[in-house]
Amino acid sequence: PSNSSAASDVYKRQEEDYYDAIHKSFDIDNTDEVVIEPFIKGREFACGILAGKALPLVEIVPKDGLFDYANKYQAGGASEICPPISLDAETQELIQRAGERAFEALRMDVYSRADFIVSDADGEFYCLEMNALPGMTAASLLPKAAKAAGYEYSELCEAIIQESMKARY
């Protein structure tokens, strides 16, 4: 469905399963819209953005298959490596700049998170989504990226409050 979050209704299907998967998606929340995307096999990275500037990337390595709802919220479902060691500095920089441009183009406000995948097939990176309100628990991806940039959790929260005040007053 087009209105789900946290990959709770993300499915990877074989071509013969498309019809059933599409109909199942329409049944969730009685929606009349679904999003169908090609599957890109690759490595996933999260790019936190604070005040329009990219934080260090976080590489997400799911224990099993996709970084779906179960792998996101199940203890041990994924490893999160920040900063990533499997990606060269130039590609990290390109992804960070793309995250900043998406933040600006979508007129995001104060903080967000851009999720990317680097294709195993061709090494190109693709933006999967922008999260306008990314998770903010101490274990969430944005606070992990901020910690790698030198922010303690309380300092990140304070920075978000200060930037929010600047944007409004």
Residue positions per predicted region:
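Phosphate-binding site of ATP-dependent enzymes
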Residues: 15-97, 125-126
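A generic alpha-helix surface/boundary motif
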Residues: 5, 97, 139-141
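Short beta-strand-to-turn element immediately C-terminal to the catalytic PLP-Schiff-base lysine
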Residues: 12-14, 49-51, 119, 128, ...
